[in-house]
Amino acid sequence: QAIFWHIYDPVKKGTWRSNRVKSITVSGNVITYTRHVPYPPLVLDSEFIGDCPGKGHSLELGSATVELVELVGADTVKITLDQAPSQTDHLLIGFTNTTPANNGNIYPVVCIRDSSTKVSRKVMRNGAAFPLYNWAVLERVDIDCSFTDTL
């Protein structure tokens, strides 16, 4: 889709951003972050590729545990933790899956995607064109301060 965006869509040309964290804030036991979303709104999807603990969210040092992940806007995710996280911890996105695939390997999973209506011209799934969603990318995000990604 990034190639299509850059070559064929004159309105969006040069504006592609992957589905990644744009800004983050921490208030007590709540982490709220916004994402660059190619085709809003965000979708919390645990059916298409599977579910995993915390919808793919965890804290690297384990200073708090994810209790709830919810979408609170077209580009905003709210994570409720069991307690306030350590400011030296990092939010990990995509590293909580423990379920092996059919080949026995365990792959990263994030249950957040955009609402792209684009489909593959060649790949089919259950008799229908394969959807080309933009899934959230794997990330390690500092939570020690608020930031905004301006790229």
Predicted regions and their residues:
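Short acidic/polar inter-strand loop motif in beta-rich domains
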Residues: F95-R113
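Surface beta-strand/loop "capping" patches
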Residues: W5-D51, E60-V72
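Short beta-strand/loop motifs in extracellular/secreted proteins, especially
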Residues: K55-H57, D89
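Contiguous mid-protein beta-loop-alpha structural module that forms a pocket-lining wall or clamp
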Residues: Q1-I3
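Short beta-strand elements
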Residues: P108-L151
